Amino acid sequence: MELDFGHFDERDKTSRNMRGSRMNGLPSPTHSAHCSFYRTRTLQALSNEKKAKKVRFYRNGDRYFKGIVYAVSSDRFRSFDALLADLTRSLSDNINLPQGVRYIYTIDGSRKIGSMDELEEGESYVCSSDNFFKKVEYTKNVNPNWSVNVKTSANMKAPQSLASSNSAQARENKDFVRPKLVTIIRSGVKPRKAVRVLLNKKTAHSFEQVLTDITEAIKLETGVVKKLYTLDGKQVTCLHDFFGDDDVFIACGPEKFRYAQDDFSLDENECRVMKGNPSATAGPKASPTPQKTSAKSPGPMRRSKSPADSGNDQDANGTSSSQLSTPKSKQSPISTPTSPGSLRKHKDLYLPLSLDDSDSLGDSM
């Protein structure tokens, strides 16, 4: 006798499907649209995480470097330190990045990048060795259409227009730029450091660029040079102020400048730096010495040629000429000072020198 249990199997399948669908009030995850949407969202997030971001990196303070394009992704760089190490191998040099890449800034220096998630597609960043951003027109030598991002290409039009306007303004203002040597004195307690900076059409492109060069030369303890003042207390606000009547400027950092009279007065060392090389001022003082010796040197020759008024003068001339011809005769009066002849010779030894001094004084007068 055979028993048919097929209807029991179909009933069990139906009950299992109903229990699975009614557990959360939603269809089964295997056959629901919610599961397909979840899978799509997960794949999209994974693709976005693995998608490389195209960014450009510059060297801090290098206005002639066109930058290097990097494809930054989590597959290529496992951590932010790995990105810094790879940038060090690509960008490190002894001038702008002597200690490698340790910091990454935005192109305007307003923000410091701390992770790869903060990097945005199509943007530009500046790599630095120290915690100091140098404000330079980095995008001046770069084609603005390098990025495929539409938003970035639209934003890059503004710096291009600013660069064109700045170049036009520079062409208009080239008349007042002339070769000039200015003295920059560091503000603070004396003795203060002073440097001389040459300004011309090749070194003075903009006011910000001159401030950057002065910062590198003067090396303030507080960092960046923010303000410059003349000795009259007038603040320098534009490039045209460097080419006025003032040649000496006081460099100040972010700290509040103290308007004290002593800050605008120069001491002896600072005045020497203004005048130039200190050895140049000491040169004329040393020149009269050889002239005085040259005036003394022809003295004995002139006295030997001129006739003497007394016999003592003739003896004096005779002894002096013999002493000049034979240097051993100088030791004879000194060896026997007690003899009368030695006293006479010793007396005559100093006579021409005193006469020559009087003659030289008379000639100088």
Swiss-Prot record:
Residues 307-341 have a biased composition (Polar residues). It comes from the Eukaryota. Changing residue 192 to W: In LISX1 and SBHX. Changing residue 59 to L: In LISX1 and SBHX. GO terms for molecular function: microtubule binding; protein kinase binding. It comes from Homo sapiens. Changing residue 47 to R: In LISX1 and SBHX. Keywords: Cell projection, Chromosomal rearrangement, Cytoplasm, Developmental protein, Differentiation, Disease variant, Epilepsy, Lissencephaly, Microtubule, Neurogenesis, Phosphoprotein, Repeat, Ubl conjugation. Interacts with tubulin. Interacts with USP9X. Coiled coil: none annotated. The gene is DCX. It is found in: Cytoplasm; Cell projection, Neuron projection. Transmembrane segments: none annotated. CDD domains: DCX1_DCX, DCX2. The modification Phosphotyrosine is found at residue 70. The keyword Repeat applies. The lineage of its organism: Eukaryota, Metazoa, Chordata, Craniata, Vertebrata. Phosphorylation by MARK1, MARK2 and PKA regulates its ability to bind microtubules. Phosphorylation at Ser-265 and Ser-297 seems to occur only in neonatal brain, the levels falling precipitously by postnatal day 21. Ubiquitinated by MDM2, leading to its degradation by the proteasome. Ubiquitinated by MDM2 and subsequent degradation leads to reduce the dendritic spine density of olfactory bulb granule cells. Its main location: cytoplasm. Microtubule-associated protein required for initial steps of neuronal dispersion and cortex lamination during cerebral cortex development. May act by competing with the putative neuronal protein kinase DCLK1 in binding to a target protein. May in that way participate in a signaling pathway that is crucial for neuronal interaction before and during migration, possibly as part of a calcium ion-dependent signal transduction pathway. May be part with PAFAH1B1/LIS-1 of overlapping, but distinct, signaling pathways that promote neuronal migration. This is Neuronal migration protein doublecortin. The modification Phosphoserine is found at residues 28, 47, 74, 90, 110, 115, 265, 287, 294, 297, 306, 332, 339, 342, 354, 360.
